[in-house]
């Protein structure tokens, strides 16, 4: 066995959407400016290619308009004329919403990697932290010590992660070592039969399904993404020291031991798979409890029940997951986990976040997307370890 294989474990992870998934790439398109509706398709305009196709008379009129009208008005007129001549170049996305798409509507653009490795690693990280909390006897103390209500709302639980995962660097270096830095997740290495679609993502009240908010987004609706997940083990160096350096050496050794203990645990595919399975299946249970008996969501309830039946037994190499935008606190943070250990602290965090974010508490809403005239939760997918 090579030296490298002793300290490195790598395996392939395949991700498939079960319902449309959206990971925002940070860009928006505006209908009539850099995107057009053409029949049942959205065209994300490639201006470089479109300008190459544009006839000289149209370009002259566009240039004249730019001198006398606002740029967005001139652009809209220019594109309208090119559209009528079928001269628009760009990525064409099927429109899968019945909602009217008005001029100047904004569309959130899917990330260029669809679901980047950083998004998948963030989900895995949250699952591991929840798994570790379930295994340690002093979880209540870690939660009590780790919550900081003085921090920005989204960061109130970072202290819990620090207590579980961080070790101080040797005193002269300062700072901390995050034990989960041993995990790396590549961006997708293969894209298989990928389908994108434009859909309306909705936030509704859990009890009445009343509208709270909505937006248009390009989603990943079908296909397979392949990633490489790598777990590194750090070789414990042979350290010799003078007596006055012994404390520093012990700090280094303790830090490496903590990191490698975690690496040994995570490096077991069974442990990682079972941890992510528990995480995903808990998410299914939480959502089923929210929607149980809601007539309009019966097909969604059936879908989750099938996922639970197919993927929540320990003899499968695939697990359910919920990833991306509008998937709720449960899938992105450890805050909902606090309720299981200390309801009082959970209520304090809930109150703090509601005050700062000025919106309905996450657990009181559902995030839905229309698929073939039915409503389903956004972001459900299947993760398989090969």
Q: What is each residue range found by the language model?
A:
Residues 1-386:
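Basic, Gly/Ser/Thr-rich N-terminal segments that form RNA-phosphate-binding interfaces in CRISPR RAMP
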């Amino acid at each position: 066995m090579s030296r490298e294989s002793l300290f490195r474990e790598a395996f392939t992870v395949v991700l498939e959407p079960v319902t449309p998934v959206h990971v925002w790439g940070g860009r928006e398109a505006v209908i009539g400016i850099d995107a057009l509706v053409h029949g049942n398709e959205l065209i994300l305009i490639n201006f470089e290619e479109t300008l190459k196709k544009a006839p000289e008379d149209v370009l002259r009129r566009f240039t004249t308009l730019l001198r006398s009208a606002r740029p967005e008005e001139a652009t809209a007129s220019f594109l309208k004329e090119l559209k009528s001549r079928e001269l628009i170049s760009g990525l064409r996305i099927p429109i899968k919403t019945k909602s009217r798409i008005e001029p100047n509507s904004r569309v959130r653009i899917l990330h260029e990697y669809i679901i980047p490795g950083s998004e998948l690693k963030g989900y895995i990280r949250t699952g591991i932290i929840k798994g570790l909390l379930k295994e340690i006897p002093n979880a209540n103390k870690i939660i009590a010590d780790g919550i900081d209500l003085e921090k920005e709302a989204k960061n109130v639980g970072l202290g819990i992660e620090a207590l579980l995962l961080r070790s101080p660097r040797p005193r002269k270096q300062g700072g901390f070592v995050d034990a989960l830095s041993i995990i790396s997740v590549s961006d997708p290495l293969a894209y298989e039969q990928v389908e994108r679609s434009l859909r309306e993502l909705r936030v509704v009240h859990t009890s009445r399904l009343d509208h709270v908010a909505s937006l248009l987004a390009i989603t990943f609706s079908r296909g397979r993404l392949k990633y490489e997940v790598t777990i590194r083990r750090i070789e414990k160096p042979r350290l010799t020291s003078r007596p006055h350096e012994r404390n520093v050496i012990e700090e280094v050794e303790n830090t490496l031991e903590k990191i490698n203990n975690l690496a040994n645990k995570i490096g077991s595919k069974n442990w990682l798979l079972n941890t992510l399975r528990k995480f995903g299946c808990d998410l299914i249970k939480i959502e089923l409890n929210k929607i149980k008996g809601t007539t309009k969501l019966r097909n969604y309830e059936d879908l989750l029940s099938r996922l639970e039946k197919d993927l929540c037994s320990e003899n499968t190499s695939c697990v359910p997951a919920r990833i991306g935008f509008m998937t709720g606190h449960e899938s992105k943070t450890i805050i909902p986990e606090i309720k299981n250990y200390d309801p009082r602290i959970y209520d304090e965090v809930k109150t703090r976040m509601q005050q700062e974010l000025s919106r309905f508490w996450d657990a009181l809403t559902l995030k839905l997307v229309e698929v073939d005239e039915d409503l389903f939760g956004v972001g459900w997918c299947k993760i398989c370890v090969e």
